[in-house]
Each structure stands twice: as structure tokens, then as C-alpha cells.
Amino acid sequence: MTLPPSCRWSGDHLELLDQRQLPGAVVFMQLRRWQQVAEAISSMAVRGAPAIGIAAAWGVVLAARSGDDLLTAFRGLRASRPTAVNLRWALNRMQAAMGSSASVDVEALTDAAAALQREDCVLTQRLVDHGVSLLAQGCRVLHHCHTGAIATGGVGTALGVIAAAHARGLLRHAWLDETRPRLQGAALSAWELGCLGVPCTVIVDGASGLLMRRGEVDAVMVGCDRVSANGDVANKIGTYNLALVARAHGIPFYVCAPGSSIDRATVDGEAITIEERDAEEITHVRGMDVAAPGAQVWNPAFDITPAHLVTGFITEFGVLRPPYREVLSELPLPNQL
């Protein structure tokens, strides 16, 4: 089965894959206003840091086509999710495409958004090729959250590496954390790998330690929403736990990080804003109440994994090894300020 794109431009509107409907149905939302794009981002209809950035870029195009105030649109889109730096990076690209002219060039903005999406397709393929080079014949890889094709504009990042390893005859098995509370691993990663015929098993998040202790994992590969200047990683809640357990068992822990996710303006992980989401994501599953009435809830969407727990960063530039502050400072990244 061919995987659907995360989004596609259709002449005068954006067609956005509604990931909330998966794995039950493949549904594309028809978006014609930037406010709809912002809502799709904040409600997690679109997920994955690269896909969020691409969607936001098309949101700017919709604002320009509608004659909306672009400053308001930029602010609204930027605020839709605070942790993923790709969102800011994409919006900065769109601001640069506007130039210094007082008039709004809709065609130039459309070209800029399309170019950003095409580039992501190329860059993710490069990243995946570098990642596959780390894996040995018969490898078993553990993955957290969802980092597949529909989370990007191309083949995906960490899950793309797993899929490519299977296609090249290297992968023995993929283990997928279910990834509470939104179940991205069970709903999205398992769906993508199933479509591609990749052998995989979904596990509860807390089972990863037992799996490693039994010698069933050769590598852990995850994506990221932001990498700070020193190599600290903001990613889906539970990533830090996974990195600690991997270190305890001597298992390499790799972070797939496209250049758009690397934020050299943020000194370390402590400076990264951690999004906190609605309590109902924990107290309810598929609309069913599963928590005791009145139970207090804390629902951070991300955590911070310290750089010293990262074996290597897999990027479109190659595989990066410590010392990360020095290595990251030398990458030819665009200005994200």
C-alpha cells in the first residue's frame, strides 16, 4: 500500500491528512483559512515536527490568498504548538520569502511553501540513508511515538530508517512503544509499518526495560521536536525514560534530527518550553472515562533527554557524535531566530 502524504496543495486550498482518524480511515481535511491550519496543528490533526512546519507554511499561503493580516497569521500559527522548533523555522522561511515589498506576493509564498515541502522529501531520504548505515544484519530496533512518512514531507525520520532497513533486508523486527496518552505508536507507527509489510510488535511503554533486559533490542531510534545547542533533546514524553534504560543495558540510543529541528539559539534543554496538554487525554481513551472521578492530572507532551545519553544524532548531514555543542555549532543550518 502506498502511504498518503501528510498534506498536499490543491490549487486554492490545503488538503491535510487527519491523523486523528487513523488507523480507522484515511481522511483529508479541506482547509481554506490559516485559522483552520492553526487549529489542526494544536488539535494534533497533523503531527510530527516536519509535517507541522510544512502545514504552517501552507497556512501562510492561505492567509495571503484570503487577504488576512499576515502578522496576525504568523503569530497565530507560531503559537499553535510551542515545543517543535520546525514550526518557527518554517515560518521564518515564509517571512523571508515575503521580502521587503509592501505588497504581498501570493505566488512567491506559494512557491516557497512548495519548495519547503520538496526539500523535506529530499532531506529525509538523506537522513534515512545515513541511519540505515548504522544497522547490522538481523537488527531489532525499538521506536517511540511516530516519526514516519506522514509525520514529514518525505519518507519519515526514525520510522523511515526502520522501513528502509526492512526494504534492504537488514531488519529482523521493530518494537513500537504504544506511546501514551495519544497512542501514536499503536495507531500511527504500527499502521505505517503494517502498510509497508514491516514486521513489528506494539508494546506498552513500560515494557521496554524488560525487552532490553531479555536481549531483544539492538538499537533504539527516536525522532525529536527540538535539539538545543548542547545536544539536549525535546521529544515525546517517555523518551527520557527510554534513553536511561537503553544506557543501563548498553544499547545505542539514536536521535533522528533533521536540520530544521536543531535550535542553536536555545542553549540547553532547560530553556525549552514544554507543552502541557488537556487532562482528558489521560483520563479518557477513545471517549471512555478511565480515571477515578476528580483525579488530578499532569500531562506534559514532551520531556528532555540530556545530551550525554544520546549515542548519535542521525541527520541529513551524516551521523553526529559527541562533543555535540562543538559539532552542532559547525552545521550549515539556516538562521532560526
UniProtKB/Swiss-Prot annotation:
User: Which keywords accompany this UniProt record?
Assistant: Amino-acid biosynthesis, Isomerase, Methionine biosynthesis
Question: Any signal peptide, and if so, which residues?
Answer: none
Q: Which InterPro entries match?
A: IF-2B-related (IPR000649), IF-M1Pi (IPR005251), IF_2B-like_C (IPR042529), Initiation_fac_2B_a/b/d (IPR011559), M1Pi_N (IPR027363), NagB/RpiA_transferase-like (IPR037171)
Q: Which molecular function GO terms apply here?
A: S-methyl-5-thioribose-1-phosphate isomerase activity
Q: Binding of substrate: at which residues?
A: R47, G48, A49, R81, Q184, N235, K236
Note the Pfam families from the entry. Answer: IF-2B
Q: Reaction catalysed?
A: 5-(methylsulfanyl)-alpha-D-ribose 1-phosphate = 5-(methylsulfanyl)-D-ribulose 1-phosphate
Per the UniProt record, the site (Transition state stabilizer) maps to C145
Give the EC number(s) listed in the UniProt record: 5.3.1.23
- Stored Gene3D superfamilies: translation initiation factor eif-2b, domain 1 (1.20.120.420), Translation initiation factor eif-2b, domain 2 (3.40.50.10470)
Q: Which NCBIfam families match?
A: eIF-2B_rel (TIGR00524), PRK05720.1 (NF004326), salvage_mtnA (TIGR00512)
* Protein name as catalogued: Methylthioribose-1-phosphate isomerase
* Biological classification of the source: Bacteria, Bacillati, Cyanobacteriota, Cyanophyceae, Synechococcales
Which gene is this protein's source?
Answer: mtnA
